[in-house]
Amino acid sequence: MPASVWKDDAARLRLEHWYERFLARVPGPVERRQVPTRHGQSHVLVAGRADGPVVVALHPMRAGAAHLLSELGPLLAHCRVVAPDLPDQSVRGLQLRLPLADDALARWLLDVLDGLELRAVNLFGVSWGGFVARLTASTALERVRRLALLVPAGVANGSHVTGLMKMAVPMIRWRLRPSDANLRRVLDPLFTTWDREWSDYVAGTLRDMPMDMRIPPLASDDALRRLTMPVLVLGGAEDISFPGDAVVRRVTAMAPHADGELIPGCKHSPPATEEFREWLAARLRRFLE
């Protein structure tokens, strides 16, 4: 179904500016590619060590490949990271809303891998990107060598009532009076650490991107059991969206070769600090070895 990530042309330009701003934070050269898929040309960024192991990285909702790469600097020193822009979530992605209840997003990603001539890959997904990564691995397990998930959607959901209580009133207050203090109240349930650039970007998306209220469906037990490749799942101990303890417990109980870790103090948006970036890169490298 056709969809638009932006509300109007002015919003699109602002979102494109933010995309380039995050892209400028990525260390080293970044290659831009257009890859054919059944739904049209898809935008992909490629960065990192040219002879390193390939990792396909999928970004969270309402962000983009540039945003994720900007947080993976230490990993880029060791790995070749391929980051597609997801449909209906990024200003550089396909303006197309694919269904969540079937394998449409997985088929799109498999088209991207085919276009890049990548047969079997290491797959890493964050939040919404974690849902797409898990879905792809369950759909075509022969295409995924190893699967890493960070605060993934589609495994275990938090309380909608709790989320509403913590965010709805601050959101209304911020929309009526968009001050920095009110923005902090909106984002505090989600952000582990306060980052000026990320907070300003999210404020921009609240103004410029339509809200997509869909929640990825929970994976069935059978879908998780089909994950026969090595799996690493990292959950946020204070994630109200997708509670880390439930996420880690479910994946490690169902996937036969899964390892899980609960990140202390981590909300849904992990720390935007160099210390966490270094920790994540080291954890992923150990998993890939």
Language-model region placement:
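Conserved alpha/beta-hydrolase catalytic His-Asp/Glu region
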Residues: G158-G163, W174-T228
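Catalytic active-site module of serine/aspartate enzymes centered on a nucleophile-bearing elbow/loop
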Residues: H257-E289
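Flexible "cap/lid" loop of the alpha/beta hydrolase fold
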Residues: F131-S138, R145-W174
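Acidic catalytic loop of the alpha/beta-hydrolase fold
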Residues: E238-F242, S269
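Short beta-strand/loop motif that positions the catalytic acidic residue
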Residues: L227, V233-G235
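Conserved HGGG/HGGXW glycine-rich cap/lid loop of the alpha/beta-hydrolase fold
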Residues: H43-V91
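Alpha/beta-hydrolase fold catalytic core
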Residues: M1-P53, H78-C79, E274, A281-E289
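Active-site loop/oxyanion-hole signature of alpha/beta-hydrolase fold enzymes
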Residues: A83-F124
